[in-house]
């Protein structure tokens, strides 16, 4: 299991995540398509939180990694281990931290929101394109805006881009009108099986729901207003994060555009 530092979230994002992880309550949501590394980030969060002093319970389908000091429950509808009934049973055990693999429907969202507001820290995942779309998605799932504003603490939207092979990457011959700076592109060698890429790199955006954003969500402000507010507090989009990593030579502009735009 990765630790949070090895996720390569960037200093500011890591600082935000660590601060919110150590709060006594609230909801942290990880979003992105299948295969975007959400589970890895979730497990890294649990790994950071695990402690003898904390009661941590997770409900998963499947259990991808075993974590010491975490009570992990495997969901299995065939034998009656249903998601929402398990979630209610977990709440009766009064844990400090709850991790649920995915918020699947309105009922599980309702239970999760209420858990976050009654002294539990809750971590879960959702399928949305970016961090701000998560607010709309929760509203579409019939959540009340005042509940979202009070419960939601952090949204991390993420993608995985292919990492340029460190042994054969070369300076890009292309000139991008939109982007300033020097970039790299794949070449291909024996070490990367002539693909030009070697491994994956995480690009993520971390949207902290502070007082101002919570107020705007409560007032049902649109995405443009929310983005302006987030930017005021230094929010960087996935694309901006990716651009930074492309300038560092970790990935190429073409790969970034393929994954994020």
Walk through the language-model features, giving the residues of each:
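Short, flexible helix-loop junctions that flank or precede catalytic/ligand sites
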Residues: 1-261
